[in-house]
Swiss-Prot record:
UniProt similarity note: Belongs to the TRAFAC class TrmE-Era-EngA-EngB-Septin-like GTPase superfamily. EngB GTPase family.
Keyword tags: Cell cycle, Cell division, GTP-binding, Magnesium, Metal-binding, Nucleotide-binding, Septation
Protein's UniProt name: Probable GTP-binding protein EngB
Binding-site positions, GTP: 30-37, 57-61, 75-78, 142-145, 174-176
GO molecular function, a single term: metal ion binding
Keyword Magnesium listed: yes
Binding positions for Mg(2+) per the UniProt entry: S37, T59
Organism this protein belongs to: Shouchella clausii (strain KSM-K16) (Alkalihalobacillus clausii)
Gene that this sequence comes from: engB
Length: 197
């Protein structure tokens, strides 16, 4: 998809702060430092729109990125990072759970996992939780440029097996460094939203 307009339109910690224009939303979930901000920047052709950080756990709000005035990417705080207090983690958890389980505009979750490693227990819990709530999932294996091409399929198979992936859930590989998988990711997203480019 050709992105002509992209902006961070809303930052929210509670439902009253969510967008009101009823555009379809795709949430991005994943462990801290899996590359969500880099994924957003590459997909939207905007280098510094989503701020990347060497500090895991940097995103502490729901960040709504409006794209072409047609849909939103919603960056969700990364999970599985220990260097925040239990109280903060509980607050994030509640905020994320409320958004994911109650938001009508949410059409799917892009769950990002690192292609180099088997999904963690947190990844598995997140995937199972979304399945429990009937939320469609598009799995994106990031950092594909970090391993040889010959190992991609083996790693994707391991990811699918570890998560006990449902056959209907797409599993894509992606590299924010090279743009690999970007067109396929957009095709999958638009197909899922049943909208044309």
């Amino acid at each position: 998809m050709k992105v002509t307009k992209a902006e961070l339109a809303h930052v929210a910690v509670k439902a009253e702060q969510y967008p009101k224009n009823q555009l379809p939303e795709l949430a991005l979930a994943g462990r801290s430092n899996v590359g969500k901000s880099s994924f957003i920047n590459k997909m939207l052709n905007r280098k510094g729109l989503a701020r990347t950080s060497g500090q895991p756990g940097k995103t502490q709000t729901l960040n709504f990125y409006e794209i072409n005035e047609r849909l939103y990417f919603v960056d969700v705080p990364g999970y599985g990072y220990a260097k925040v207090s239990k109280t903060e983690r509980a607050a994030w958890g509640k905020m994320i759970e409320t958004y994911l389980s109650e938001r009508e505009e949410l059409k799917a979750v892009l769950q990002l996992v690192d292609i180099r490693h088997r999904p963690s227990e947190d990844d598995q819990l997140m995937y199972n939780w979304m399945k429990h709530y009937g939320i469609p999932v598009i799995l994106v294996a990031t950092k594909a440029d970090k391993i040889p091409k010959g190992k991609w399929q083996k790693q994707l198979t391991a990811i699918a097996k570890t998560l006990d992936k449902e056959a209907s859930d797409p599993l894509l590989f992606f590299s924010s460094a090279t743009g690999l998988g970007k067109d396929e990711a957009w095709r999958t997203i638009l197909n899922h939203l049943k909208v044309t480019e």
